[in-house]
Amino acid sequence: DKGVHDCIKADGVEIEIFNDQIIYEPGFLRTGQDNPFSVFTPFKRRWIENFDMKFLDIDFDYPIKDKLNFDSNVENFDFGLSATHGVDMSLWPVGEISALDRVKDFLDNKAIDYSKNRNDPMLDGTSRISPYLACGIISSKRCILEGLKKNNFELSSGHIGITKWIDEIVWR
């Protein structure tokens, strides 16, 4: 990111950088000895101590730039993975709307039992959103917001399955 920023800035293009997908800047939460956390419980405690609901504001009012003038249909794009890698592309439909639908479906139908079902491969007990998070299609910020809405805005109480899922998104 820094290399791209420097290149574009050198060409005289103004760039504004902001963290839209995370709650805290990397390295912000540190131990009392000013080290990165290596254990979840103290990390989560510090995370909650510093948390403010305003961190979850998702501003949808940014000006929309003119779209590029070409047709694109990613949904029908052949990545060539199915034949060579045996990947069922229907498992992860393309796009942010599909990712958000998956999060909401998980929270509505599976999250209550998540803490007991998440480690059993025989059960379909997980959210299956890792690819969406890894690719930046949906943010951990958005997932936490949706989880909190479903859990009456409770981080540490409420439905144990939802709090466990939020814990794992926080640690991610």
Q: What spans do the regions from the language model cover?
A:
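Trp/Phe/Arg-rich N-terminal binding region typifying the photolyase-homology
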Residues: 1-55
